[in-house]
């Protein structure tokens, strides 16, 4: 089958969950000309979250990848030009109130507000698990449909 797609920023969004949520924000921050919206659900958005196992070799690689690309630090250190570009993307994040990394999401929200970059942040009942993420997907799809209709 063939599907019609829009090959422009207005027809493109990026989303992810957990580390993928952080990754979606990293990519959208570095390529704001490509996406009209970026979504993160339960995203690991800063390196200050350090699980107990981070000192083992099997886990240290992903931890340092977050430290090197922190979406929170990106906003904190962005130039005026980068801030203007970030304002062209619709940002949305959600996280469960019992998720151990919720504070990285709060930090991102605070930094975005400090720079007056519009962002939607939702905290719902839930943990860092598939039960929470299954509820997030319909919300993300509804928001993107709205974005496509009004772009």
Range-by-range predicted roles:
Residues 1-151:
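Non-catalytic cap/lid and distal C-terminal segments of serine-dependent acyl enzymes
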